Structure formats: C-alpha cells, structure tokens
Curated annotation (Swiss-Prot):
A molecular function (GO) term: pyridoxal phosphate binding
Pfam families, sorted: Aminotran_1_2 (PF00155)
Species the sequence originates in: Sinorhizobium fredii (strain NBRC 101917 / NGR234)
Any one Gene Ontology BP term: biosynthetic process
InterPro entries from the UniProt entry: Aminotransferase_I/II_large (IPR004839), Nucleotide-diphossugar_trans (IPR029044), PyrdxlP-dep_Trfase (IPR015424), PyrdxlP-dep_Trfase_major (IPR015421), PyrdxlP-dep_Trfase_small (IPR015422)
Alphabetically ordered keywords of this record: Plasmid
Span of the signal peptide: none
Protein name: Uncharacterized protein y4rO
Tree of life domain: Bacteria
Record carries keyword Membrane: no
Family (UniProt): To Rhizobium NGR234A y4qD.
Length: 618
C-alpha cells in the first residue's frame, strides 16, 4: 500500500442481534439517526480522509456488503471474513496480512458503537503512534487500564481485580485504537500461539519498550456502545436534534435512565453510594432478581433497627407516593398544606378536600401560628408539612413544629411531616421531629430512603407514628410484598457504609454553599437560602419566563432543570428549582445561565427600544 497513509480496520459481528417486541436486527445494521451504525462509521472515516477501510465481518458478509454500498467517497473499501474469530480481537488483528507492508496510521474499531466524528479527527491529528481510547464508566468491563501522569499506559487490571475505589482503575478501553503497524507485527511475531484475549495483547505490548501506548480519554457521549434495545434508543435520542430531545424529556415523569441527558432535576444524593455498594448489589443480583423479596413485616423489622423505632410504629412502602395513598385511604382526610409544595401530597386527594396555605414570596418561610389558625378555620383533619420544603428548601425549626403540633392536637388535627431531605440540612438528623413522636402520638412522619441513598430506582420509603391503629391501617392498604429485593438488600448492607453516608451529606452541604455563591454571580437572579440539596431561584425580570430559560438550557446546552410554572403558587413561571450536583456540573450550568442572561438582557433592551416584542428563539 505505497500510497495509503491512513488505514482503518473495523471488526463487526452481525451475529449480535438487537431484539425488540416487533423486530430483530443485527446490531451493526441497526439504524441510528436513519443510518445503519456500521455504514455511519464507514462514512465518517471517508469524510475524515481515511484512504482505506477494511471491514472484517465475523458472519453475514452479504448483509454487510449490502448496507455499505455507496459509502466510500473516494475511500477504498474491502470487506473480509475475520480469519480467526475469537474473544480477543486485537490479537487477531496483529496477524492480518493487510498490514504486512503498511507503514502509515492504523485505526482499529472493535465495538458496535456510535462515535462522534471529532474523536476520529483527534486520533488522526495526534502525533502519538499508539493510542487506546478510554472512558470512565459504571459498567464492569473485562479489562481496565492504568496510565501515568503523561498519559502512557502502565498496567492493566482484569475485571475481577479487588481494586475498586481508584479513579484510574475505572478507566476502560472503549474499542477504539490507533496503532503503529510495526507494533502489531511485533506482537504477531511474539505470540504466534495465542488464547485470543485482549489482556494478552496489552501484556505483550507493555513488554515492547520501543512502542509506548498512550491513553486518550473520550467523553461518554462521544462513544455510545449499542448492544441492546435500550442502547439503541439512547443512541437515537443522542443523535436527534436538541428540540426533539427536549420534547421527549418534557413528557417524562420518570424513566430518565433510558436517555443520556444531563439534569439538575432528580433530587438524589449525588455523593452516595460508593462503587463498592454497587459491587455488593451486583454480587447478589441473581438471587435478588430470581427469588422473591421478604414481606412487609420482615423488612419493617430491619427498618426498626435502622431508625431505632419500634416495628409496630412503622409501615414500609414502594416509595413515599405509595404510603401517601395508603395513609389518605385510611384517614379520608381534609388537608391543609403550605404551598408551593411536593405535588404528590395534593394529587393523592380529591381537589375539594385540599386547602392551600400560600407561603410569603419574599422568603417562603412558614408562619406556624398563621398556619395553625388556617387549619382551624378550614376544619382540617390533617395538616401536611414537607420539611425542608420542596421546592423552596426552607426549613421549619423543631421548636416551631412542636408548637404547631400542640395547637393542631387541640383541634384534633393530625400533623404529617415529610422529612425526606432532613439529612441535607445543616444540623442533619438534629432537625428531625422523630423525637416528638412520643409526645404527639397522632403525628406521622414520612421519609423516602431512595433519595438520600442516591438510588432513585430503589423505591423505598417508610411511615412512622406512635398511633399503632394508624400504622396497622396503612399496612393493610399496602401489598404484602411491596418492596423489591434490591431495596431490601440495601437495608442489610447500609450499616457497613455509615461513614461514607454521613460524609456524603457533609459534602452535599458544602456543594450547596458553593453552588449558591456561583449562582449569586448572575445579576438579578434571586437565590433563596436552602436547607436541602436543591436551590430555589427567582429569575430576573429580563427573562421571559422560567420555562423559556429551561427550554434554552435543554436545547442549547443539553441540561434539564425544573421550572415551577405548574406549582401551586403565584408567579410560579418565574422560578427554577436546581438540584445541587458536584462542582463541575454546577459550574457548567452557571456558565450556561450567564450566557443566557446576557442574551436575554440584550433582548429585553432591544424590545424596550423598539417599543414592541423583539423576536427571541429558544
């Protein structure tokens, strides 16, 4: 190949099938953005200036030829059957005859993946002769790689390595490489007899001191493996326009796991769990899925140990939402509730049985005396208090709740307190009213554990009250086996991670302070002090609405935030609720909001000068 300076080798396996309820298709031939994945990669290579591409198919060469017609664009294309198909594709590539006399750049692709074109350009432009593209991922892989400060590969770790918490150990190859053909030829000479294992390939390569291999990090959104139907849906979502992505996500109430999107909406603990918790779950996964979980009474016994409350005073639910419905079903209440608030406490009861107590917009603090009088006037049987408030993050002190409970008790009105986010407050559990349950036996506490464990999919919450008749009545309205095995197992292993759990709350509190200071740099954005893991912000007057800004963030910057236009409050369309994430994600959002603010201030100025509405797009 005297005139070829760049060569690409693609190893594809049409035997890998993606199945849906309506169709079955070889993974490389599955369509993303209207084009088969394999054809998409070949087209990208041609556009990047690669002069020759060799596609090695492990099977189904006819289908591969069919979909690659007219994809060359002045690039030579060769389709071959893989000579020795096995589990170690890199070892096989080292022996192929096509590179016997080749001296240019060799790009290698061994995974069925949707790749951002910029990554191919980075590989071609790099002066490094040998590169392995890596990414950080929560998925366990068969091989993990370690590099030195200069980015050179120094060691490998098999997937079953005991090292878990090292950030370096979590870097894995994504199936994209650039090799000096001399390295491939050298490995072929050293390993004429092989076990077809990629670990063996890198072990051999590390022994060749003349051929250093460098690690190139790729953002996860730049390499999307497609091995099943959910991967395919995620890849199609990622390849769609920002407007289409926003339309999909705006309709979702849950199920975000299917779509790759950055978001400041999910109210979970982002510093927990550590990877070792997930590893423990993985080790037990087969039993947790195959065998039935325990019934309520067994799980309540474990909750009793965790909360230090008697089992007879507890009920456990598949999330707080299930407990709210069971509680309301038992009480048939007329409720009063401060607003804005969590919608699930309002939606679970008939509209004519809800009275909303509006919180003052200057600070959204609850006046407990005014609220007690409001409950009395409305002859409420239940007063609901979410503390810290969702979405405002404001906290009612324990002493004030104690006074409120005493006044409501006189009127035979129960106080229901949701303490889901109490651990994120400055005093943590010190702000809980669990200590008041003995004083006010009619009081009820509700709490979601999934949120503070950082595992929204765990779906477990509990109800606590000294009113045993109530807890028994709530239990009778719940399925006997309403908690999944994964959530149950978490209750068993969490004691091993108490220190990490407590540390996660401290880290979140620090993030709240840091994020609030960053947001304060945006002119006229009013950030309310928060005792939760989210911030409630009133938008500047120059912004058309919170929803408009949320749309701009989603479409232009790929970030989802919660606009509060549907909250039960005045001027809800002026407010955003922003979940506090680790520093880099917070910084990215603030940077995007600054740029949006500059544009909207300019838009507002132009509108005033023109004396009419100046066109503004999302």
């Amino acid at each position: 190949m005297p005139n070829v300076q760049s060569l690409a080798i693609i190893v594809t396996d049409p035997r890998l099938i993606i199945s849906t309820w309506k169709d079955r298709c070889p993974a490389p031939l599955s369509s993303v953005g209207g084009m088969p994945i394999l054809a998409r990669l070949v087209s990208q290579l041609a556009q990047a200036g690669v002069q020759k591409t060799i596609v090695f198919a492990l099977d189904g060469i006819g289908d591969v030829k069919r979909i690659l017609n007219n994809r060359m664009k002045r690039m030579e294309l060769v389709i071959r059957i893989m000579p020795t198909p096995g589990s170690g594709r890199l070892i096989d590539l080292a022996t192929i005859t096509e590179i016997a006399e080749f001296h240019g750049q060799v790009l290698v692709f061994t995974e069925n993946a949707v790749i951002d074109p910029s990554l191919i350009q980075r590989l071609l432009r790099s002066s490094d002769r040998n590169i392995t593209v890596v990414s950080r991922s929560e998925r366990r892989r068969c091989l993990r790689l370690l590099g030195d400060i200069g980015g050179r590969l120094t060691a490998m770790l098999p997937g079953d390595s005991p090292i878990r918490e090292s950030a370096s150990a979590d870097v894995s190859p994504v199936g994209i490489y650039k090799f000096d053909p001399a390295l491939l030829r050298a490995i072929a000479r050293i390993r004429p007899h092989r076990f077809n294992d990629d670990l063996e390939f890198f072990e051999t390569a590390l022994g060749l001191q003349r051929h250093q291999i460098y690690l190139m990090y790729a953002d996860p959104q730049h390499v999307r493996r497609v091995n099943d139907a959910t991967d395919l849906e995620a890849a199609n979502f990622a390849s769609s326009s920002s407007g289409d992505q926003f339309s999909i996500l705006e309709r979702l109430q849950a199920g975000n796991w299917r779509y790759p999107a950055s978001e400041h909406i999910l109210l979970c603990n982002h510093h927990f769990p550590p990877a070792s918790v997930v590893d423990r779950l993985r080790e037990r996964l087969q039993d947790l899925l195959y065998l039935q979980p325990s019934d309520q009474l067994d799980i309540i016994a474990k909750l009793s140990e965790m909360t230090d409350l008697p089992a007879r005073n507890l009920a456990v639910g598949n999330g707080v939402g299930e407990l709210i419905k069971a509680l309301y079903g038992y009480l048939d209440p007329r409720i009063v509730i401060p607003t804005p608030t969590s919608a699930q406490y309002i939606d679970a009861v008939e509209p004519n049985k809800v009275s909303r107590f509006e919180l003052p917009p200057e600070n959204f603090d609850l006046d407990v005396e005014a609220f007690a009088n409001f409950a009395k006037r409305r002859q409420a049987s239940v007063a609901v208090l979410v503390n810290p408030n969702n979405p405002t993050g404001r906290l009612v002190p324990v002493q004030e709740i104690e006074w409120l409970a005493s006044q409501l008790a006189i009127e035979k009105c129960r106080l229901v307190v949701d303490e889901t986010f109490i651990e994120f407050s400055v005093a943590g559990k010190g702000n809980s009213v669990e200590k008041l349950l003995s004083v006010f036996p009619k009081m009820v506490i509700l709490k979601s554990l999934g949120a503070i464990m950082g595992l929204g999919g765990a779906q477990i919450g509990y109800l606590a009250s000294k009113d045993e008749q109530l807890t028994h009545g709530v239990r009778r309205r719940l399925p006997l086996g309403n908690i999944n095995g994964i959530a149950e197992y978490l209750l068993w292993i969490l004691p091993e991670f108490r220190e990490e759990w407590e540390a996660s709350f401290r880290r979140t509190r620090a993030d709240v302070v840091s994020f609030s200071r960053m947001l304060d740099t945006i002119p006229e954005l009013e950030v309310h002090p928060s005792q939760a893991n989210y911030l409630f912000c009133r938008t500047p007057e120059a912004w058309p609405s919170a929803k408009h800004v949320a749309t701009m963030l989603a479409k232009r910057y790929g970030v989802l935030v919660q606009n509060c236009e549907n909250q039960c409050m005045k001027y809800g369309d002026r407010y955003l609720r922003l979940t506090v994430l680790p520093y880099e994600e917070n910084r990215y959002l603030v940077s995007a909001l600054r740029r949006i603010n500059e544009e909207l201030v300019e838009w507002s100025t132009q509108s005033k000068r023109a004396g009419t509405a100046y066109h503004l797009g999302c």
